[in-house]
Amino acid sequence: MSTVAHPSSEPRAAATRVVAALATETGLARIALGIGALHVVDDNFLQPEPGVPARDHFWGGLVQVALLVGLAWAYPQLRAGLRGTLAIYVGIFMIVMGAGEAGYYTREDGPSGDDYTGLLMIPAGALLAGIGVVTLWRSRKGGSVVRRYARRVALALAFLVTLPFVVFPFAEAYVVTHSGRAYVPTPQLGAPHENVSFTTSDGLRLHGWFVPSKNGATVISFPGRKGPQKPARLLVGEGYGVLLFDRRGEGESDGDPNALGWRGARDLEAAIAYLRSRPDVNPDRIGGVGLSVGGEMMLQAAAETDDFKAVVSEGAGIRSLREAIHMDGIEKVAPSWLFGLVTAGTTVFASDLPPPSLIDLSSEITEPVLFIHATPGQGGETLTEKYYEAATGQKEYWPAPGGHTGAFDAAPREYERRIVGFFDRNLLGS
């Protein structure tokens, strides 16, 4: 006797088959990778940073989506060992991406935009990494007990080597291009200021503070409002006008963040143009002081424009492979490898090419420069001396105490004597 399936049972059976398929290793991996692709699309195309058109992320976002979708498609066709290894690496990377977005949840203004899909990356990455671990463990059951455990030890050692030297550099590249916006702090400049804004050549609106000059000279202090205000307050106390502003992707300014300072020279060029447009600023008496990434950006801006009449660069180091290859001896090996991967990753995540080498740029600066290397500095900061040697114009070098950007706190009187004296000579002619 034949039976006829009830019509309502067919959708239920289909749903059961779908759930069963998704519950497999391949199904779960594809769900996790799909969440990753969703966040990439959201981050790059649906909800980019303020002032940034989606087309600016086209090829970088396309590469990321293609890699995730390609892995999801090829996943069941890969050998178990390769499948598990890739799942662990990509899963860890997704956790890092999600953790960066989760930082927004600790802010007063809470998450917004692509932070929500970014937060989903944490459980999705954990799921994918867990799948990878289980897959590798199951794939190594053949052979003798000694051989099985030897394989597992070899895999563990391989992970210990490849994670810090392959995966983490790419994770760092993601972090430096997706850093959270710093709060705008309370101004402590020792004088009244104006809230100002200006536009870069690529259409971004930047915001900052301006203290008018009392002695006829003006200095741009960087890394802007989020950075140490002590050098700016020192100059204000000496009568200098000072401009501090949020660079692209930070504070109240438009644009994508980039902790390595790529494209930052455009921000300084816009700041100079703004100062030159003000009737209370003498265009022949504009200087700049930059710390860390700000010091690197000052060197590039000084090389690419004659509008800076004097520049102080403190703590300049490495911002891409183009600087790392100039390290000496054995110190060149690890930084060159790591920064090679960081540079490659940043190029993709920022959809941008690395800026010119600071060695080459330093040789093009024609205006006076004071190079400060506060020892012991961070990795790559020893290149400050090479930047100084490459410079062909009027230059000074101060091997200060205090560590990275710590010269002011370590030697405040000497800092004042050197910085104020440098600007007095080159901006005021005294």
Which residues does each predicted region cover?
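Short beta-strand/loop motif that positions the catalytic acidic residue
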Residues: 364-366, 371-373
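Conserved alpha/beta-hydrolase "acid-adjacent" motif
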Residues: 377-384, 407
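Short beta-strand element of the alpha/beta-hydrolase
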Residues: 216-224
